[in-house]
């Protein structure tokens, strides 16, 4: 059986857009067929039906009314689907045969703007990633605002992932030949829709790129920036089915001009969303975003995501905030005007996309009405930033006047319903309106006349789109109708509808006038829209100034409300904060209840602050507080402190909190080590590093060794030595102060009471001598008998603890800055093992065992002699292996330094042997111990 002609056309269109859900217009509905119908029915919970399409079985089908599409499409796009809208391109009444249809738009996660959502303060970025030789190239665009920018950088995977984390695009385009490993890592950072294209074929020409932007902008592109820009423009044109005039500026930027914050650090610092709820509330953005406009909200988020690292730029923004901060009346007047401004950027985007309506243009007019007032307020400002805003703000008087003269104050909802153009703007519109008005008056007069003539008081003249005008008389009055006066038109359950020749003639006149008026108003509206479209560059420029001005005004307002101060900025490595506060925590618990703290970091004696103290005492909050104050200062904001002098940081890294990647097969400890490794590889001497509880995911001594080794790596590596806050439970590490350069002990103050402790939340100089873990457990409500037993166990363990950091700190350090046990320490352990074995009194052992299961031993003396001989040979091999390992690492470059886990494993193995109490083992236990030693030794080879 063959498909019906309509389904043949459908299949052709579907084949062209096979990666999309096809919304196929049939009359007043969008219909979906086959797999699309199954998907949409499942995702939108719609009834699945069927349609005869010429095949043996009915095709699965579901549909939605065309006027309700705006409610359904966002739900599909949010789930990561693309939707192709196929419309009827001709009037079905006038077509012969199959109605001509075509796809008018493809809606994807990266190109969809939902004006009804609550995310108007967020950008919707579409990103293209390309690789060219040894560089990554990126291009991105938000078509709703017209933003289009590109950058490139060395082929360093972490830089790419950091940029993706920062931009948070809704959709990513990659080349077909991208490696699966890189694709997986991108998905791990941001699970969004990724579309593959052949970048050799899917791109516009250089001439098309120049036509969209300018010869000057395009000629300045390197090849690694040109390719993704061409691909991005191609994708936008393909999905929008038109060239967007609001995308008219191609910006280039360098990632090194902004602070680098990796994805983990953004999450740990809760910059734009909280870790727990994944919402804006509880984040830094939640505290700072008191913006008056949607544009200002997007700008503030961008400033948080991209702190500056150029001193002049930071101080320029700070000076602007300071001027507004010092003039409360000025800021109140400014914000009063800003609150009347709509989202000009996105209105301009609608104008460009040809989907703007009359209400949007009214919103634009209202916004432009406020520009002269804002310019007047800026006239007497003195800071460089605000003066620049004053000089460059275009009031757009001509555009405002055009809108004021042409668009009605209460326009109709739809462009094809009329009632858009103001009286007096067009003579013909005025004439047609008069004709329409007279027609309505004639209808009212007809109704009164017929009521009097027939004596039927309930008679009425009505109208609907199907039957036109009619005279309606209830059936109870049917006998009162004069014979031959009316022509029956429609019969209802309780009434009859009629017409007269006179009414039919007038209907043609009235409806003719209405149709002409609607068509005329629409054509005039299009002319007005096109005139405004020519001024898009001016509109975008003023919108950018308004959004930046709103950002400055908001930062000044937040500083005033929360008692923030202007920070000083330096480049000499000094971070000095007096009475610093966590901006989010103090907002949640109240400023009066928050305990402020001082911070002093420098490049001499306070390079690494080693912070000890119990859980729940505030160590993590304090560390995040320092990072947030630094970030706020570099974004140009005032900060929560009584004074602050902040050295510019190129990067912020954090390793805070416990997390795992079970799906990726990574334990909590493995994830922790990966994060630490990433920090040690990528931090510089100008970075700020926050490390919280490094090593807690493994055994005590392993964790202590790793934590200690990391501290050494940071402080002794001349290429690193970054500003570091290092919080730990290992209070044994406090002895590193004075041994390692730049290490300074701090702790959380604790007040000891008779049966409990009080955490004072105050960071003070000096290390903690205990962890108070049992007190925290008590606060958490553990049973009293558990607490008491824990105290007993703690006392017993502490009495047996022989860990001596001074002994370890005297050991030599290999070239990779990782502390290893020196040769003499190894020898001591070996001697202990041999001594234990040689002092065995074989006469004390007497046992029986199964001769079939183990080798026959002639005498107990020979058994122990063999055991001792083996242990000596194993220790000798370990000595030789350790010597070779040390020599290998001595020759290694400092640039490739890594924590030596292999050596640590061997050290643990030797310690395990030395702890064996051979004197108390029977022959069977001795043989089992020997077997385990051999097995473990082989694993270390």
Swiss-Prot record:
InterPro entries assigned: DNA_mismatch_repair_MutS (IPR005748), DNA_mismatch_repair_MutS-lik_N (IPR007695), DNA_mismatch_repair_MutS/MSH (IPR017261), DNA_mismatch_repair_MutS_C (IPR000432), DNA_mismatch_repair_MutS_clamp (IPR007861), DNA_mismatch_repair_MutS_core (IPR007696), DNA_mismatch_repair_MutS_N (IPR016151), DNA_mismatch_repair_MutS_sf (IPR036187)
A Pfam family the protein falls into: MutS_IV
Keyword annotations from UniProtKB, A to Z: ATP-binding, DNA damage, DNA repair, DNA-binding, Nucleotide-binding
GO cellular component assignments: cytosol
Binding site for ATP: 613-620
Recorded GO MF terms: ATP binding; ATP-dependent DNA damage sensor activity; damaged DNA binding; mismatched DNA binding
Cysteines joined through disulfide linkages: none
Protein name as annotated: DNA mismatch repair protein MutS
Species of origin: Clostridium botulinum (strain Alaska E43 / Type E3)
Lineage: Bacteria, Bacillati, Bacillota, Clostridia, Eubacteriales
Annotated gene: mutS
């Amino acid at each position: 059986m063959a498909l019906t002609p309509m389904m043949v056309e459908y299949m052709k269109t579907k084949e062209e857009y096979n990666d999309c859900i096809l919304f196929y217009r049939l009359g007043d509905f969008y219909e979906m067929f086959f797999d699309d119908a199954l998907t949409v029915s499942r995702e939108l919970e719609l009834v699945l039906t069927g349609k005869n399409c010429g095949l043996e079985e009915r095709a699965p089908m579901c549909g939605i009314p065309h006027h309700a599409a705006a409610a359904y499409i966002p739900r599909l796009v949010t789930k990561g689907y693309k939707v192709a809208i196929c419309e009827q391109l001709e009037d079905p009444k006038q077509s012969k045969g199959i109605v001509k249809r075509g796809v008018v738009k493809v809606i994807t996660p990266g190109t969809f703007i939902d004006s009804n959502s609550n995310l108007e303060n967020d950008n919707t970025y579409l990103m293209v990633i390309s690789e060219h030789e040894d560089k990554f190239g990126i291009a991105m665009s938000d078509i709703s605002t017209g933003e289009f920018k590109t950058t490139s950088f060395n082929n360093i995977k972490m830089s790419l992932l950091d940029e993706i984390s920062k931009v948070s695009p809704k959709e990513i385009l990659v080349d077909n030949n991208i490696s699966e490993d890189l694709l997986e890592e991108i998905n791990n950072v941001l699970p969004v829709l990724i579309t593959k294209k052949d970048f050799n074929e899917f791109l516009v020409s250089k001439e098309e790129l120049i036509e969209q932007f300018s010869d000057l902008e395009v000629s300045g592109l390197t090849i690694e920036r040109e390719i993704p820009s061409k691909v991005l423009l191609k994708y936008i044109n393909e999905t929008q089915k038109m060239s967007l005039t609001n995308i008219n500026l191609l910006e280039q930027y360098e990632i090194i001009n902004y602070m680098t914050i990796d994805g983990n650090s953004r999450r740990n610092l809760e910059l734009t969303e909280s870790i727990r709820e994944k919402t804006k509330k509880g984040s830094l953005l939640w505290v700072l975003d008191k913006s008056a406009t949607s544009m200002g909200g997007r700008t503030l988020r961008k400033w948080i995501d991209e702190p500056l690292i150029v001193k002049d730029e930071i101080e320029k923004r700070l000076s602007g905030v300071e001027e507004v901060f010092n003039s409360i009346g000025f800021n109140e007047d400014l914000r009063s005007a800003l609150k009347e401004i709509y989202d000009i950027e996105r209105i301009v985007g609608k104008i460009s996309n040809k989907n703007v309506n009359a209400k949007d243009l009214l919103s634009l007019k209202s916004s432009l009405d406020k520009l002269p007032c804002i310019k007047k307020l800026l006239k007497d400002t003195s800071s460089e930033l605000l003066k620049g805003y004053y000089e460059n703000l275009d009031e757009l008087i001509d555009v405002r006047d055009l809108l004021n003269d042409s668009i009605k104050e209460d326009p109709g909802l739809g462009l094809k319903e009329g009632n858009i153009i103001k009286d007096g703007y067009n003579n013909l519109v005025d004439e047609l309106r008069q004709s329409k008005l007279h027609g309505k008056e004639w209808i009212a007069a007809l109704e009164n006349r017929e009521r009097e003539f027939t004596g039927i008081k309930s008679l009425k003249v009505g109208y609907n789109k199907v039957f036109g005008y009619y005279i309606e008389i209830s059936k109870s009055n049917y006998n009162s109708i004069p014979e031959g006066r009316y022509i029956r038109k429609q019969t209802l359950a309780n009434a009859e509808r009629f017409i007269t020749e006179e009414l039919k003639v007038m209907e043609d006149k009235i409806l003719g006038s209405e149709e002409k008026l609607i068509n005329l108003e629409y054509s005039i509206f299009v002319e007005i829209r096109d005139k405004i479209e020519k001024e898009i560059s001016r509109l975008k420029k003023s919108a950018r100034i308004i959004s930046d001005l709103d950002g400055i005004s908001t930062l000044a307002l937040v500083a005033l409300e929360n008692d923030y101060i202007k920070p000083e900025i330096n480049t000499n490595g000094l971070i000095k904060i007096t009475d610093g506060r966590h901006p989010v925590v103090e907002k949640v618990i109240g400023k009066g209840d928050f305990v402020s703290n001082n911070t002093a970091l420098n490049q001499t004696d306070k390079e690494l602050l080693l912070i000890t103290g119990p859980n729940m005492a505030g160590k993590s909050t304090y560390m995040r507080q320092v990072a947030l104050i630094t970030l706020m200062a570099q974004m140009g904001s005032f900060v929560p402190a009584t004074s602050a002098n902040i050295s510019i940081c190129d990067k912020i890294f954090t390793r805070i909190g416990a997390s795992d990647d079970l799906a990726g097969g990574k334990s909590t400890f493995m994830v922790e080590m990966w994060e630490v490794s990433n920090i040690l590889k990528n931090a510089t001497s100008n970075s700020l590093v926050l490390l919280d509880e490094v090593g807690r995911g493994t055994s005590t001594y392993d964790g202590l060794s790793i934590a200690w080794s990391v501290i050494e790596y940071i402080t002794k590596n001349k290429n690193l030595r970054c500003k570091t806050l290092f919080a730990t439970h290992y209070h044994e590490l406090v002895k590193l102060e004075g041994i390692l350069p730049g290490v300074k002990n701090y702790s959380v103050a604790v007040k000891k009471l008779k049966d409990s402790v009080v955490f004072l939340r105050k960071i003070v100089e000096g290390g903690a001598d205990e962890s108070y873990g049992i007190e925290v457990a008590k606060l958490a409500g553990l049973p009293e008998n558990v607490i008491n037993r824990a105290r007993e166990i703690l006392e017993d363990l502490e009495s047996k603890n022989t860990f001596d950091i001074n002994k370890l700190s005297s050991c030599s350090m290999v070239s990779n800055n990782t502390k290893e046990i020196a040769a003499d320490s190894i020898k001591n352990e070996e001697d202990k093992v041999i001594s234990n074995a040689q002092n065995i009194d074989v006469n004390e052992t007497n046992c029986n065992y199964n001769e079939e299961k183990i080798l026959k031993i002639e005498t107990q003396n020979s058994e122990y002699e063999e055991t001792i001989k083996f242990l000596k040979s194993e220790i000798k091999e370990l000595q030789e292996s350790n010597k070779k390992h040390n020599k290998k690492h001595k020759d290694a470059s400092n640039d490739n330094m890594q924590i030596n886990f292999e050596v640590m494993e061997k050290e643990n193995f030797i310690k395990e042997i030395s702890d064996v109490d051979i004197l108390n083992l029977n022959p069977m236990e001795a043989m089992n111990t020997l077997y385990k030693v051999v097995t473990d030794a082989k694993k270390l080879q």
